[in-house]
Amino acid sequence: MKRGSWIISQTWGNLFFLNFITSYGNLRKIVPQHLKLDSFQGYYFTSIVPFQMSDVSFPFTPSLPFSRLNELNLRTYVTYEGVPGIYFFTLDSNHRIANFVARNFFHLPYRYSNMHLRKNENFYQFKSNHAELSFKIGQSRVKNDRDKFITDRYFLFTQDKKFVLRGQVLHEPWVLH
């Protein structure tokens, strides 16, 4: 990316996708009407995604020293004007300042949650006020079409009063295990 062409940079690590098939009717009730629910082979997905964020910076700053945090988001998959993306129901993190900035400047539904991640070789345990998840990861694998539908998303959508807001999210393709 050219300097100045981005608003915020972050490093994401220890990221997991836990995916669930969800009914269209249940999702339609809680996703803003301007967003079209996106499906893969007729199935609608909701994902829980815990991860660690670090090295947050803005175009005019180095990485902020206090920018390491744990996060857990609950998301679904949508399109807006033909562009596929993510809609977040909630984004929990253990960093009050980051939550304030994300809520007030990016209109994202962040809330505070006490969170911890413990890692022991290939075993991970993620605890928050709202969830407790344990994982054991294996070898990396080749992505199938459903994996690509879920992980190869480069836009997020949120709503501020009457307006749909779109943010581009640039990242390398995720390596899955």
Please identify what each model-predicted range represents:
Residues 1-59:
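Hydrophobic, proline/glycine-rich low-complexity stretches
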Residues 40-44, 53-92, 96:
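A glycine-rich, hydrophobic loop/mini-helix early in the fold
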Residues 47, 54-56, 65, 103-107, ...:
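Short, charged/polar low-complexity linear motifs in solvent-exposed/disordered segments
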Residues 73-177:
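Internal, well-folded beta-alpha domain core
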